[in-house]
């Protein structure tokens, strides 16, 4: 009986418009129409005015259009602080004449556009929850316990979007565009938690978003940007309907230095395997302390705390895995416990 097979490629980038490495994959045999998603780390500031995300997205849209391919999920996360390396992670899938044997599964979906007045509110949570369920169906994953990472690109509020909403007589959750990034990430993460049965949707209200950090998802990774108005969703997990050498597991870091949990997750994966990708979330602990010691990431008026966190957690993970092309996304509201976050590890078994 046929099955689906996933492929994962980590490609270096010399800039947000450098898609040559991915085009080289196409030249060497990867079918462009088999690509379902591209995750990128671009070298902007990762904040509201980070235009490297949109630049990279447009570069990939142009590339895929040359091959007649449409509908690829293109999710760009800005910020390669510290020694993090700009890169792309390309996810592809194909049907093969091999029985399913429980392997990495990939599913994608997009939600309808989110009205600005719904951003950071309960409506966004419910919209994302439906999108995650759709992506799980696309991946052939029935059990939420088999989901190990849910990557979401969500919108933010710009001055123009705020003005348009208010001109229509509607109110928005905040007038602070930077704060809107956190609200959007947080609501999207809670949507993941609802979809996976980690939280009861009836128990969450607008006031809980980015305030009740005891509510979180074990595997949500959300990144906000001004280059979209909907949500792009990628679900990664394990499914018996898939075959191939790729496997995934994940850890939930309890704080920014919780290397132990990450190492334990790696140990659960096949020993005779090579690292295919590492995907992680990072945030400054809102308590202002890590393991009881004070940090100053939240007190820096020049550099956003999310930028500090990406650099810090990136260094921790680089020390564990020995690579710097790590997908580390900042801002982990409701994505793991406060100050922590999920880390997904994808490996390829040696043949």
UniProtKB/Swiss-Prot annotation:
Site residues, Important for substrate specificity: 306
UniProt key word Hydrolase: yes
EC number: 3.5.2.15
Region annotation (RU B) ranges: 103-240
GO terms of biological process kind: atrazine catabolic process
EC class: hydrolase
Binding residues for Mg(2+): 283, 332, 335-337, 340
Region ranges (RU A): 1-96
Pfam families to which the protein is assigned, alphabetical: Amido_AtzD_TrzD (PF09663)
Membrane-traversing stretches: none
Residue numbers annotated as active site: 153, 223
Activity regulation field: Inhibited by barbituric acid.
Residues that bind substrate: 53, 77-78, 185, 223-224, 310, 329-330
Keywords recorded for this protein, A-Z: Hydrolase, Magnesium, Metal-binding, Plasmid
Domain notes: The monomer structure is formed from three repeating units (RUs) that share the same structure as one another. The monomer, the active site and substrate all possess threefold rotational symmetry, to the extent that the active site possesses three potential Ser-Lys catalytic dyads. It is possible that any or all of the three active-site serines may act as nucleophile (albeit only one can do so per catalytic cycle).
Similarity comment text for this entry: Belongs to the cyclic amide hydrolase (CyAH) family.
Subunit structure: Homotetramer.
Name this protein carries in UniProt: Cyanuric acid amidohydrolase
Organism, as annotated: Rhizobium leguminosarum bv. trifolii (strain WSM1325)
């Amino acid at each position: 009986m046929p099955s689906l097979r996933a492929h994962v490629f980590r490609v270096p980038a010399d800039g947000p418009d450098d898609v040559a490495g991915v085009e080289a994959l196409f030249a060497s045999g990867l079918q462009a129409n088999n690509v379902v998603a591209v995750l990128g780390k671009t070298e902007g500031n990762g904040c509201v005015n980070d235009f490297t995300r949109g630049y990279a997205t447009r570069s990939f849209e142009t590339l895929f259009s040359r091959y007649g391919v449409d509908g690829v999920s293109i999710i760009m996360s800005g910020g390669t602080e510290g020694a993090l390396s700009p890169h792309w992670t390309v996810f592809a899938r194909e049907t093969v004449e091999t029985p399913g044997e429980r392997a990495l599964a990939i599913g994608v979906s997009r939600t309808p556009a989110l009205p600005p007045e719904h951003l950071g509110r309960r409506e966004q949570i419910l919209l994302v929850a439906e999108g995650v369920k759709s992506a799980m169906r696309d991946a052939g994953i029935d059990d939420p316990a088999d989901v190990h990472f849910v990557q979401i690109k969500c919108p933010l509020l710009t001055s123009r979007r705020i003005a348009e909403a208010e001109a229509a007589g509607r109110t928005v959750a905040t007038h602070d565009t930077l704060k809107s990034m956190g609200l959007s990430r947080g609501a999207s993460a809670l949507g993941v938690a609802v979809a996976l049965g980690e939280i009861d949707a009836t128990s969450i209200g607008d006031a809980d978003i980015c305030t009740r950090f005891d509510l979180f998802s074990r595997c949500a990774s959300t990144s906000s940007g001004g280059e979209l108005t909907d949500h792009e969703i990628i679900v990664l997990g394990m499914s018996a309907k898939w075959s191939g050498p790729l496997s995934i597991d994940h850890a939930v870091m309890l704080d920014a230095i919780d290397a132990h949990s990450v190492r334990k997750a790696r140990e659960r994966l096949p020993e005779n395997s090579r690292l295919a990708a590492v995907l992680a979330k990072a945030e400054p602990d809102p308590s202002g302390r890590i393991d009881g010691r004070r940090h100053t990431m939240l007190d820096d008026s020049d550099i956003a705390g999310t930028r500090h966190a990406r650099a810090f957690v990136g260094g921790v993970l680089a020390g564990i895995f020995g690579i710097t092309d790590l997908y580390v996304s900042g801002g982990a509201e409701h994505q793991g416990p406060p100050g922590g976050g999920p880390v997904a590890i994808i490996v390829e078994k040696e043949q």
